[in-house]
């Protein structure tokens, strides 16, 4: 809605439409692509959610997949259920594309005026303030206050938690995953920019699809592929099985995170590269700069903000990622998310308060970093 043109409202007025009619007949239909993207994200997050539905003992496909593998050690059933969940996700995209029926949502960028803000007054102002305050209270103030109260009231749970180990494990995953994701994102984006190779472009486009898949499907698919590939090499060449190198290890976690969040990293770097005109590279080559020197002295400084933003977004995703970490983590390897889940699964809500609070604090630090430093740039 913010990026829509005021010209649309003026067209509605010229057609004799009231404010409400203009909104429902012009503004709302024009915002459909953004609304559909938002609804798709909500639908995918809901379908792939594990912690919430498991805590409330609601039987969903994600909990069934997890139980099939962890509780019954039945990888075949886990794969079959994963396929069903994947089918529903693909069905959402297909139905949305069919419903568009070739509709176009382009706007002429010339002469566009932003929609002016409306200063609310009286009852409207009170209602808007109360509504937003209730949302903020229910979603942040109340749960954080309750967790803080439990942490203070039950210090024995705090003393039983290895705080530094949880921090180091969480930050280790964040650092390694961010390093590999950002490095490969630079390699693919710079390769597409320099080589114009269609195969590399297609592979890059295909590789960003992992973010649309629920983490639990990726974890099960990862275990299935590694097990199959290891058994294949063992049967052909007589190699020792290397399953343990990838399954139940930090290496496996980082690879799974890479597949899951490469889209986030790739598109973040790509958006920065789209703002660097190709003529800048051509002028650098005319001045005798090599491709590496152009990359290191021009591209990297220009993309500094994008690198920081991508790193923070990856960190936010990884610290709260639960299904992948639960299934692929090493033995006795805990993060704040898995520790909070393990306590909640035992119905020890008071014990789960402290790791949950630490998770919120880390997320708040990352979000404040984005708002204060990156966005101000």
Predicted regions and their residues:
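Transmembrane alpha-helices
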Residues: 1, 5, 19-48, 130-134, ...
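C-terminal transmembrane helix and the adjacent membrane-cytosol boundary/short C-terminal tail
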Residues: 2-13, 19-20, 52, 79-120, ...
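Cytoplasmic-entry segments and transmembrane alpha-helices of multi-pass inner-membrane transporters
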Residues: 9, 122-131, 187-226
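Periplasmic/extracellular loop-to-transmembrane helix junction in inner-membrane transport proteins
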Residues: 20, 24, 28, 67-75, ...
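Membrane-interfacial helix termini and adjacent extracytoplasmic/periplasmic loops
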Residues: 20-21, 53-59, 112-117, 159-164, ...
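Loop-to-helix entry region at the N-terminal start of transmembrane alpha-helices
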Residues: 33-34, 127-132, 162-174, 212, ...
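Interhelical loop and adjacent transmembrane-helix boundary motif
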Residues: 50-90, 121, 150-161, 319, ...
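Transmembrane alpha-helix signature in integral membrane proteins
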Residues: 85-89, 95-99, 161-194, 199-202, ...
């Amino acid at each position: 809605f913010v990026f829509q043109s005021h010209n649309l409202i003026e067209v509605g007025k010229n057609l004799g439409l009231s404010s409400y009619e203009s909104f429902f007949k012009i503004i709302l239909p024009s915002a459909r692509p953004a609304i559909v993207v938002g609804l798709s994200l909500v639908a995918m997050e809901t379908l792939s959610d594990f912690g919430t539905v498991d805590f409330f003992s609601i039987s969903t496909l994600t909990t069934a997949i997890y139980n099939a593998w962890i509780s019954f050690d039945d990888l075949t059933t886990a794969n079959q259920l994963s396929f069903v969940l994947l089918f529903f996700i693909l069905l959402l995209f297909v139905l949305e594309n069919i419903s568009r029926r070739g509709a176009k949502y382009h706007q002429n960028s010339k002469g566009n005026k932003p929609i002016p803000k409306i200063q609310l007054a009286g009852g409207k102002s009170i209602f808007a303030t109360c509504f937003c305050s209730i949302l903020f209270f229910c979603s942040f103030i109340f749960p954080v206050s309750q967790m803080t109260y439990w942490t203070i009231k039950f210090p024995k749970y705090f003393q039983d938690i290895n705080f530094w180990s949880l921090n180091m494990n969480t930050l280790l995953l964040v650092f390694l995953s961010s390093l590999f994701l950002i490095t490969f994102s630079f390699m693919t984006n710079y390769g597409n920019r320099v080589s114009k190779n269609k195969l590399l472009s297609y592979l890059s486009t295909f590789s960003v699809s992992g973010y649309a898949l629920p983490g639990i499907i990726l974890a099960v698919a990862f275990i299935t592929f590694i097990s199959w590939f290891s058994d294949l090499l063992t049967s052909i060449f007589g190699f020792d099985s290397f399953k343990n190198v990838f399954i139940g290890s930090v290496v496996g976690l980082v690879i799974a995170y890479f597949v899951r969040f490469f889209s986030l990293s790739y598109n973040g770097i790509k958006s920065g590269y789209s703002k660097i005109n190709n003529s800048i590279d051509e002028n650098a080559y005319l001045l005798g700069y090599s491709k590496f020197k152009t990359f290191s002295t021009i591209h990297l400084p220009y993309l500094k903000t994008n690198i920081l933003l991508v790193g923070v977004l990856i960190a936010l995703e990884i610290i709260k990622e639960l299904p992948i970490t639960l299934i692929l983590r090493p033995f006795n390897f805990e993060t704040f998310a898995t520790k909070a889940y393990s306590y909640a699964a035992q119905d020890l809500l008071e014990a789960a308060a402290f790791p949950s609070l630490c998770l919120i604090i880390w997320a708040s630090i990352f979000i404040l970093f984005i708002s204060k430093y990156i966005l101000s740039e």
